[in-house]
Amino acid sequence: MSQMVLVADIGGTHARFALMGPDGEAVNPVVLRCADYDGPAPAIKAYLAEHAGGVAPKGGAFAVASVIDGDRIELTNSPWRFSIAETRQAVGLQRLEVVNDFTAVALSVRHLKPEHLMSVGGGMPEAGLPIAVLGPGTGLGVSALIPSASGEWTALATEGGHVTMAAATEREARILDRLRTQFDHVSAERVLSGQGLVNLYQAVAALSGHQAVFSTPDVITKRGLDGSCPVSREAVEVFFAMMGTVAGNLALSLGAKGGVFIAGGILPRMAEAFRLSSFRTRFEAHGRFQPYLAAIPTWLITHPLPAFVGLAGLVTDPKNA
């Protein structure tokens, strides 16, 4: 594409916008709060009016935290509901491609630079084999890159964050039992997301006979990492361990010998604590398949906008991003 393209990463809490040229570099990136706008069209118009420098893009590539099934988009953890066609027309785009947000993250992993990846154990990746991608944010995103015989890659659009969460210890079983009194289905996302950390904290508090005095993941994380609140500390530790369980299950399901990449808005902000946590031990703790998983490398993506890196692939080389 010779002209600038509008790219967007639309999650449950924030929508990130930028302009992108054929070199794949994001220009004028801006983060807007979804709650401040009635939908993507008003947010896009605000971005273009205030931050685009007079550029009127004709094409768009959006990553959205939603199932992509036809024209209608309903974000999983946001009140935004919109039509792709109507949005395209409302903001004056001639072309608009929309993919799942973690599909875009999956498309990014082969293009990330070493400085945007933090190793969290394991061996070396095996070339040409499946790659797993997951990460907690407002929800729990899950995707994968699957290679073809011709050397091209397909990014899977999945709803793997809604698989049933399994306990690996008696304490986790009690925590999940407690959460089942609140939710008909305790999915992985119910514990591995921003609200999921709050859910874990509340369950741990109840089981420990303490009052749950905190209500935001940021405060729980801070109090857990600095050790000032034992309940918060246990909630964060359980969060890391359950991430290992889910990531290990995903690696086994995919045969992800190409590696496991972890993204999302939560873990990069506590990267060192995550690296030193029980995540990797739990990732490998799958009985007879411990040696199999021990060889699979895991990385934390520290790039601030990995979805934009993936969208750049769609913009510059849509056939084999």
Curated annotation (Swiss-Prot):
InterPro entries recorded: ATPase_NBD, Bacterial_glucokinase, Glucokinase
Top-level enzyme category: transferase
Residues given in the record as ATP binding sites: 8-13
EC annotation from Swiss-Prot or TrEMBL: 2.7.1.2
One Pfam family named in its UniProt record: Glucokinase
Compartment annotation: Cytoplasm
Catalytic activity: D-glucose + ATP = D-glucose 6-phosphate + ADP + H(+)
Chief localisation class: cytoplasm
Family: Belongs to the bacterial glucokinase family.
Cellular component terms (Gene Ontology): cytosol
Phylogenetic lineage: Bacteria, Pseudomonadati, Pseudomonadota, Alphaproteobacteria, Rhodospirillales
NCBIfam families according to UniProt: glk, PRK12408.1
Keyword vocabulary terms for this entry: ATP-binding, Cytoplasm, Glycolysis, Kinase, Nucleotide-binding, Transferase
Domain of life where this protein originates: Bacteria
Protein name per its UniProtKB record: Glucokinase
UniProt key word Kinase: yes
One GO MF term: D-glucose binding
PANTHER family: GLUCOKINASE
